[in-house]
UniProtKB/Swiss-Prot annotation:
Transmembrane annotation, as ranges: none
Domain of life (superkingdom): Bacteria
Source organism per UniProt: Escherichia coli (strain K12)
This protein's name: UPF0757 protein YmgG
UniProt gene name: ymgG
Induction field: By heat shock (shift from 30 to 45 degrees Celsius) (at protein level).
Family: Belongs to the UPF0757 family.
Length: 114
């Protein structure tokens, strides 16, 4: 419990500090917010990493301008590939949904970097 409180405090301090906030883009803010949510779910480091990845993907998709457009294109392709991969692994609908989320997140982040 003490580790969770300490980690949440550190994430909050980084997220809320004024100089850091001024220079962050939506992808970074999403990653920090997702990491905080992942921490609060109680899944430890695994939850923090998954939350940060999904938060970064959502942040990348909501970016304005060319970066956001590229991220949205990447998310579409990544989600489609992930869903097909999830079905082909034999996990049915659940695998397709998980694959689409993971693929869409990765595609959005990579698309933004394009």
């Amino acid at each position: 419990m003490k580790k969770k409180i300490l980690a949440f405090g550190l994430i909050s301090a980084l997220f809320c500090s004024t100089p850091a906030m001024a220079d962050m883009n939506r992808t970074t803010k999403g990653a920090l917010l997702g990491a905080g949510v992942g921490l609060l779910t109680g899944n430890g480091v695994n939850g923090v990493l998954k939350g940060a990845a999904v938060g970064a993907g959502v942040g990348a998709v909501t970016e304005k301008g060319r970066d956001g457009k590229n991220a949205r294109k990447g998310a579409k392709v990544g989600a489609a590939v992930g869903a097909v991969t999830g079905v082909l692994t034999g996990n049915g609908l659940e695998g397709a949904i998980k694959g689409a989320v993971i693929g869409g997140t990765g595609g959005a982040i990579l698309g933004k970097m394009k």
